A protein has these predicted regions:
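Short hydrophobic core segments
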Residues: 6, 29, 168-178, 308
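Short beta-strand to alpha-helix junction loop
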Residues: 55-65, 87-94, 129-145, 241-246
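N-terminal Rossmann-like FAD-binding beta1-loop-alpha1 element of flavoenzymes
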Residues: 2-27
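Dinucleotide-binding Rossmann-like beta1-alpha1 core, especially the glycine-rich loop
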Residues: 44-117
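C-terminal catalytic lobe of FAD-dependent flavoproteins
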Residues: 264-331
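Helical element adjacent to the flavin cofactor pocket in flavoenzyme catalytic cores
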Residues: 129-167, 171, 175
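Active-site substrate-recognition segment that forms the wall
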Residues: 17-21, 47, 78-79, 176-288
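Glycine-rich FAD pyrophosphate-binding loop
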Residues: 20-40
């Protein structure tokens, strides 16, 4: 069976690997000249199913728990399993209690344990939540590793060229994200913004989430001395540079986490349009011989492995798990 995958972001690359593992001939097509230059390029890369349950449905936890093992096998050496630390300023202690009430898989940590986990945060926060079973990766390195692995497996890539002849393929798997807004019923775009900061005055070993009733922040360590900041979710499909308000909120929150971030260099800013359905859960939608994998919202790296597996099961006509959003939430 010959499969055409449209879209070379995280959804398309994970689907390509899953289908290749099952012995299918896979071709990946993208109008962009390089892989992963859409929303995937600006992702945080947090493999945090328990934390994400705070604002997501149970399906995100159910589908996301296998992500760490999948990425660890698919991209050896790129997954860091140091957990996630969640903290809040003393004045926002209620936010920490609220977060705890909506999640599981954590243990309460006091000031001493916060200092043990993250020495540079010593004395800054009295209470926190530690989600020991979570991890993170660098999305850009992970996608590059998947690309290399797929090339070695014989996957053909058509990047940046004219439209490909779809008639010669038995199945088409469309992973083009927000490009399907207006075509897939209920799909919308949600703008996400991010910053990269550079400083050697602060060191973090894991993603840290700083809770605030208006400006929640996550900060994810990359290579030494570099940090990715994110968390904006703006209900618009308008692309373009990061807004002044978002940048100020990011920097204020980073400064609240540690004052040394006030002297950091801003080395990159960016925005991505995340595809989302009304319930913010991904779906698998069939139209003739095309299977759409879409709607991962802010959970692309967390949920794409599970969605790829479910889509491959469907293509092979296997029984699909009841956790499959396609069964419960078809478009």
């Amino acid at each position: 069976m010959r499969i055409l995958i449209k879209g070379a972001g995280v959804a398309g690359l994970t689907a390509a690997l899953e289908l290749t593992r099952r012995g299918l001939a896979v071709t990946v097509f993208d109008t962009a000249p390089q892989i992963g230059r859409g929303a995937s390029w600006f992702a945080g890369g947090m493999l945090a199913p328990w934390c994400e349950r705070e604002s997501a449905e149970q399906a995100v936890l159910d589908l996301g728990q296998s992500a760490l093992d999948w990425w660890e096998e698919a991209t050896p050496g790129l997954v860091t399993r140091n957990g996630t630390l969640v903290v809040a300023p003393a004045r926002d202690r209620e936010e920490l209690s609220r977060f705890a009430s909506r999640t599981s898989g954590y243990r309460l940590v006091d000031e001493d344990e916060i200092a043990r986990l993250e020495p540079d945060l010593a004395g800054r926060f009295r209470h926190g939540l530690f989600f020991e079973g979570e991890g993170h990766l660098d999305p850009r390195l992970a996608m590059a590793a998947l690309h290399r692995r797929l090339l070695e497996s014989g996957v053909v890539f058509h990047l940046g060229g004219a439209a490909i002849d779809e008639g010669s393929f038995d199945r088409i798997v469309d992973c083009t994200g927000h490009a399907q807004v207006g075509s897939l019923s209920g799909l919308r775009g949600v703008r996400g913004e991010m910053l990269y900061l550079a400083t050697h005055e602060v060191s973090l070993s894991r993603p840290v989430r700083l809770l605030h009733p208006r400006i929640p922040l996550y900060i994810v360590p990359r290579e030494p001395g570099r940090f990715m900041l994110g968390a904006t979710m703006i209900e618009t499909e308008e692309a373009g540079p990061i807004s002044a308000r978002s940048m100020m909120e990011f920097l204020n929150a980073a400064y609240a986490l540690h004052p040394s971030f006030g002297e950091a260099q801003i080395i990159e800013s960016g925005t991505g349009i995340r595809p989302a359905f009304p319930d913010n859960l991904p779906r698998i939608v069939q139209e003739d011989k095309t299977l759409f994998i879409n709607g991962a919202h802010r959970h692309g790296f967390l949920l794409s492995p599970a969605m790829a597996r479910l889509a491959a099961d469907f293509i092979e006509h296997k029984e699909v798990s009841h956790a499959d959003p396609r069964q419960r939430r078809s478009a």
